[in-house]
Amino acid sequence: MATKLDYYAVLEVTRDANGDELKKAYRRLAMQYHPDRNPGDASAEARFKEINEAYDILKDEQKRAAYDRFGHAAFEGGGPGAGGFDFGGGLGDIFEQMFGDMMGGRRGGRRSGSDIQIQVSISFTEAFTGVKKPITVPTRVTCESCEGTGSADRDQGAETCPTCHGAGKVRAQQGFFLVERACPTCHGAGKVVRNPCAACHGAGTVERERTLEVAIPAGVEDGTRIRLSGEGEAGGKGAAPGDLYIHVAVEPHPIFQRDGANIYCRVPLRMSLAALGTEIEVPVVDGSRTKVKVPAGTQTGENFRLRGKGFSVLRSSARGDMYIQVSVETPRHLTKRQRELLEEFEAEAGDHERANPESTGFFSKVRDFFEGKL
């Protein structure tokens, strides 16, 4: 058996090279020794295969760790990377290796695309009315060069794996157990690419940015998660794509507050208008205005309900309400005439219980308290 070169030497990098350095070296060398650039050159083709083999191992953290520990033996028959057990991970890893594939574990079958998580900020008003938002999603999409096959030769495409014969799994005797696990050659895909696509390096997908228009329904709350099935990263070599999860962040409003489907708006009101009664015009979240009658004698904290002016309730035809909360303002700075009028008012009001029922009742209780009646 021919002696294999060190994978780090094949990629012309040091053993502490990071992922970006590995990728850069791989792309440079793969381009240099690609068979399309070296037609009929058997040595270049062999070198190209070595480069792909080395990168396939070193780009994967688990495979790289196994290679650093055991060398090429990790991926040969009986080695830890090719079916043997590595007890360094504890009992959980051992049982996952033994039973993971038979019970639908992560190693079996083609690898579906990853899910994507993205946050979208919308205004309070947009949450009220609903909105369509264009979003840019960094993702992996099907490679156009090879149409997702991962092969430079579209007609040939991927070949049936010679190890598992297309099953994606292999069986091995481990002591008393017959263990079924993902094929170490094709990693569960059932197929292998002999001539990898230069654009996607055999993955079948490439990194791109996509722009989507997302419909955010009326009534969403801060923290709502929206799932778009199949809009995640493309699966490798024909596998199913992942999903896109949009986390909605609703910006606060300077005038309105929200509690569930209900909206609250605090409206300051002059003391005189609260005493005499009035009609006020208040804003609604959708930009319209409505009038509210405030009866004479209105106190701070009283609410006036506007039915159906709140948020839509998701997956329902119901709507919340809007509440106008009155806050009676006491003037801080008075003119001489205003002070005189208030003094006249106070002298006239006196202890008149009908005019000031709450204060009269309160001070009556205070008097009873000091007299020992309470």
Curated annotation (Swiss-Prot):
CDD domains: DnaJ, DnaJ_C, DnaJ_zf. The keyword Protein biosynthesis does not apply. GO terms for molecular function: ATP binding; heat shock protein binding; unfolded protein binding; zinc ion binding. GO terms for cellular component: cytoplasm. It is found in: Cytoplasm. Participates actively in the response to hyperosmotic and heat shock by preventing the aggregation of stress-denatured proteins and by disaggregating proteins, also in an autonomous, DnaK-independent fashion. Unfolded proteins bind initially to DnaJ; upon interaction with the DnaJ-bound protein, DnaK hydrolyzes its bound ATP, resulting in the formation of a stable complex. GrpE releases ADP from DnaK; ATP binding to DnaK triggers the release of the substrate protein, thus completing the reaction cycle. PANTHER family: CHAPERONE PROTEIN DNAJ, DNAJ HOMOLOG 1, MITOCHONDRIAL-RELATED. The J domain is necessary and sufficient to stimulate DnaK ATPase activity. Zinc center 1 plays an important role in the autonomous, DnaK-independent chaperone activity of DnaJ. Zinc center 2 is essential for interaction with DnaK and for DnaJ activity. Belongs to the DnaJ family. This is Chaperone protein DnaJ. It comes from Gluconacetobacter diazotrophicus (strain ATCC 49037 / DSM 5601 / CCUG 37298 / CIP 103539 / LMG 7603 / PAl5).
